[in-house]
Design a protein with these regions (language model features):
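N-terminal Rossmann-like NAD(P) cofactor-binding module of classical short-chain dehydrogenase/reductase
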Residues: 10, 78-79, 101
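NAD(P)H cofactor-binding loop motif with strongest signal on the N-terminal glycine-rich segment
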Residues: 13-14, 82, 105
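Adenosine-nucleotide cofactor-binding segment
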Residues: 27-89
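Glycine-rich phosphate-binding loop and adjacent beta-alpha segment
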Residues: 85-164, 197-203
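C-terminal capping/lid region of NAD(P)-dependent oxidoreductase domains
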Residues: 157, 161-172, 179-203
Length: 203
C-alpha cells in the first residue's frame, strides 16, 4: 500500500495478531495510526503497540470518528482483516488517492464494493492472499515476487531486532487445545495470537 511517513493509517481489528503488527509497522514507518478495537482491553493493547487513537466500532460511528480525527480528509491507507461493515465504513472515510488493503473477512461478510466510490476519490483496493506467495494451491507467485517477499521479511526481522515489533501472545496451548484456541478466536476473546505448543500432554 506504499504507506509514507506522515500519512494516516487506519487499522481494523487492531487487537488481533495481524492488526497489532500493522499498528506497529505503521508507527515504525512514521504514520499516524488510528485503530478500531472492541472493548477497553483490546483498545489498551492497540494503544500499547502504538495506536495514537482507538475507535470502538460497537459504540462509535467509525466513519465520523476517522473524519473528525483527520480534519475531514480521511485515512490515506486502510488495513482491513475484518470486512463487513468496517470495510463499508472505510470506503467512506478514505482520503482521495487512498489505498485499502484487504486481507480477510473475520466479520463473516465479504463486502461488495460500489465502484463509483473508487472512481470519484481515486481509491485503490488491494487484495493480499498470503497463499499466493507461499505457493499454496494452483496459483503461484513468480520467482521475482518470491524474492520480493524475502526482502520484506528481512525488513520485518530488522524492525523486530530493533525493538520496534512486539508480537503479542494471548496464551500458549498444547496441540490438543486446538479446539479451545479456535473457539476463543471465534468468540473474539483473543488479543494477539494463540500459540500451539507440541509436547506436554501431547507427548
Amino acid at each position: 500500500a506504499a504507506l509514507a511517513p506522515g500519512e494516516t493509517l487506519l487499522v481494523h481489528g487492531a487487537a488481533g495478531a495481524s492488526g497489532l503488527a500493522a499498528v506497529e509497522i505503521g508507527r515504525a514507518l512514521g504514520a499516524e495510526v488510528i485503530a478500531t478495537a472492541g472493548g477497553e482491553a483490546k483498545a489498551a493493547a492497540a494503544r500499547a503497540h502504538g495506536a495514537a487513537h482507538v475507535i470502538d466500532p460497537r459504540r462509535e460511528d467509525v466513519r465520523a470518528a476517522v473524519l473528525d480525527l483527520t480534519g475531514g480528509r480521511g485515512a490515506d491507507v486502510v488495513f482491513d482483516p475484518v470486512g463487513g461493515d468496517l470495510f463499508d465504513s472505510a470506503l467512506r472515510c478514505t482520503a482521495p488517492l487512498g489505498r485499502i488493503l484487504t486481507i480477510g473477512y473475520a466479520s463473516g461478510r465479504i463486502p461488495q464494493i460500489p465502484a463509483n466510490l473508487l472512481l470519484v476519490k481515486n481509491i485503490s483496493v488491494i487484495g493480499l492472499y498470503w497463499g499466493f506467495y507461499m505457493a499454496w494451491g494452483k496459483t503461484r507467485a513468480s520467482p521475482a515476487l518470491r524474492a520480493k517477499v524475502r526482502e520484506m521479511f528481512a525488513e520485518l526481522f530488522a524492525l523486530f531486532e530493533a525493538g520496534k515489533l512486539h508480537p503479542e501472545v494471548d496464551r500458549e496451548l498444547p496441540l490438543s487445545g486446538f479446539a479451545e484456541g479456535l473457539r476463543r478466536v471465534q468468540d473474539r476473546g483473543v488479543i494477539g495470537k494463540i500459540v500451539l505448543v507440541p509436547g506436554g500432554d501431547d507427548a
